[in-house]
Every structure is written in structure tokens, then in C-alpha cells.
Swiss-Prot record:
Its EC number is 2.1.2.9. Attaches a formyl group to the free amino group of methionyl-tRNA(fMet). The formyl group appears to play a dual role in the initiator identity of N-formylmethionyl-tRNA by promoting its recognition by IF2 and preventing the misappropriation of this tRNA by the elongation apparatus. Keywords: Protein biosynthesis, Transferase. Belongs to the Fmt family. This is Methionyl-tRNA formyltransferase. The keyword Acyltransferase does not apply. (6S)-5,6,7,8-tetrahydrofolate binds at S109, L110, L111, P112. GO terms for molecular function: methionyl-tRNA formyltransferase activity. CDD domains: FMT_core_Met-tRNA-FMT_N. The lineage of its organism: Bacteria, Pseudomonadati, Pseudomonadota, Alphaproteobacteria, Rickettsiales. SUPFAM superfamilies: FMT C-terminal domain-like (SSF50486), Formyltransferase (SSF53328). It is an enzyme of class 2 (transferase).
Length: 299
């Protein structure tokens, strides 16, 4: 089977590696173009790009697939199927119609719940008890195509964005293999648009004084490692935390261990990181402060 693989971040690498390990005929890899990264703004290739080059697979990095030139190039690979995993570009109808078995997508949520760009973060933010992977046939809508296979699992108390990302990536790779092995027998299941909800891209990682404590706690988990508070114009990331219910406040730091009183409870940071410094245990962090943050309020 001739496969075009389309993906960019680390989430997609597991699926590509599995296809290569099984000696599938990956005829081309489509990924986002290298972009400036780091302090020196050096052009950096996507994780998928790096894996493909090491395997001597042709890499394509178009800015768009809407032109007839790009569509003809795609068709010239004569793909039986295109596998899509966090690619980052919209696939027009002309591309969707080229592969014999269409374009199938690995989506890290239980569709139709959490269609869109940030399903893992929104799964945690909403307090969902379970999540999973959906292998779906792409259509012109936003993650609205029929489902080919789906598998779910319970979310553990210790899970955060990183742990779910890794679990879903591994599960997605395994589920993809089952779909490809049964590609001619698949019976697509239409999604219910009435049950759909959407996971917009997250742009704001701040924990606010007005947040309910449980929401703040979920933000720490969902936005790992980017959730932060601001105190006296200092930006402090919270990488791990617990919370205790029943007390209530408006963003006051109530003791020397930097416990934060919020609506419905107290957020208890465990691991934090000041801008420009390494992550550290909360006890080491407060020990290194020049002045206590007790009685101060987060912004």
C-alpha cells in the first residue's frame, strides 16, 4: 500500500515510526516548513521532517495545498491512502479525493467531542473523566468526517497535558495500524453534529485571581508546562500543584509555602519556575526569594 504521511509535531512521530518499522511503503511525507526557533532564530525542522529525512523519504513542505501545482504533485505520488496526524494545513477537496482510500486522520479525542486544534487541553479543562483516540475519514469540515475506529481510556489523577499527549500518541499509532490492516473492510460511522463541541487553540495560559480553584488546578494540568501566575509583576510558572476545597478567597497568597486562596479552595503549588530559571520544588523556590510573597495577591 502506497502511503503519504502528513504530520508535524512529536505527536505524529510515533505513527510514522510504526509505519516505517513495519516496512510500509511511505512514498512521501508532508510537514510544516522549517521555522525560526530559539534565541538565535535558527530554522528548525519539525520532528516528522527529521524522521523522514533519516529514512530517505521525500519531504514536502508546501505553505498551502490549494494550488493546482501542489495538487498535481500530490497525485503523482499515486497514494492509496494519506495518513494525517496534526499536520497543520487544511486539505482541500481536490486533495481528499486523490488517494484510493481517502485521507484518514488520527485525532486525540472521542469525536464528536472536542473537534478542533486543542482537544487534549480542553479535555482536561472541562474535567472529563475519560478520553481516547478517533481514527476518522477526513472530509471538508472541521474534524467532522465519519469515524473508522475509536478507543477510550480513563484519565488518571496524575495525568497532565504531557502524559495524555504521550498516551494518545501511542494509542493513535496502534489504532491506525488496525485501520490500515482492515482498510477494505472498514464501515465508517457518521458523527452526530448535535453532540459536537469544539476545542479552540489556547492562547492564554494565565491563572487569574478570579478563577475558581478547581479551574486553576485544571489549568496547571491542561497547560503544562505553560500555566502561570503574576505576582508583583513577576511571572511564575506552576508546573505541578494540588488543591484543597472548602476555603475561599480572591487570589491571596496565604502562607510562606505560596498557597493561593481562590474561589472554592486553595491551590497548592508543588513545582514552579521563575522566568529564566530552572524548575524547582516549591520549598527551594520560596527559600530563594528575597522577600516573602505572603499576603500578596496574584493579578
Amino acid at each position: 500500500m502506497r502511503i503519504i504521511f502528513m504530520g508535524s509535531p512529536g505527536f505524529a512521530v510515533g505513527a510514522l515510526n510504526l509505519l516505517l518499522k513495519l516496512q510500509s511503503e511511505v512514498v512521501a511525507v508532508y510537514t510544516k516548513a522549517p521555522k525560526p526557533s530559539g534565541r538565535r532564530q535558527r530554522l528548525t525542522k519539525s520532528p516528522v521532517h527529521i524522521v523522514a529525512e533519516k529514512s530517505d523519504i521525500e519531504v514536502c513542505t508546501p505553505a498551502s495545498l490549494k494550488s493546482s501545482i501542489e495538487q498535481e504533485k500530490f497525485g503523482n505520488f499515486k497514494p492509496d491512502v494519506a495518513v494525517v496526524a496534526a499536520y497543520g494545513l487544511i486539505l482541500p477537496k481536490e486533495i481528499l479525493n486523490i488517494p484510493k482510500y481517502g485521507c484518514i486522520n488520527i485525532h486525540p479525542s472521542l469525536l464528536p467531542r472536542w473537534r478542533g486544534a486543542a482537544p487534549i487541553q480542553h479535555t482536561i479543562l472541562a474535567g472529563d473523566q475519560e478520553t481516547g483516540v478517533s481514527i476518522m475519514q477526513l472530509d471538508e469540515g472541521l474534524d467532522s468526517g465519519p469515524i473508522l475506529k475509536q478507543k477510550k481510556f480513563l484519565i488518571e489523577k496524575s495525568d497532565n497535558y504531557k502524559t495524555l499527549y504521550d498516551k494518545l500518541s501511542e494509542l493513535g499509532s496502534d489504532l491506525l495500524l488496525k485501520v490500515l490492516n482492515e482498510i477494505e473492510k472498514q464501515v465508517p460511522l457518521k458523527q452526530s453534529d448535535n453532540d459536537a463541541c469544539y476545542a479552540d487553540k489556547v492562547k492564554d495560559y494565565k491563572i487569574y485571581a478570579s478563577d475558581a480553584c478547581e479551574i486553576a488546578y485544571r489549568k496547571v494540568k491542561a497547560f503544562y508546562p505553560k500555566a502561570f501566575i503574576k505576582v508583583e509583576n513577576k511571572r511564575i510558572k506552576i508546573l505541578d500543584a494540588e488543591f484543597e476545597a472548602f476555603t475561599s478567597g480572591q487570589g491571596e497568597i496565604i502562607n510562606d509555602n505560596m498557597h493561593i486562596s481562590l474561589k472554592g479552595g486553595t491551590l497548592i503549588p508543588k513545582v514552579v519556575q521563575m522566568e529564566g530559571r530552572n524548575p524547582c520544588d516549591i520549598k527551594d523556590f520560596v527559600r530563594g526569594l528575597k522577600s516573602s510573597l505572603t499576603k500578596k495577591f496574584i493579578e
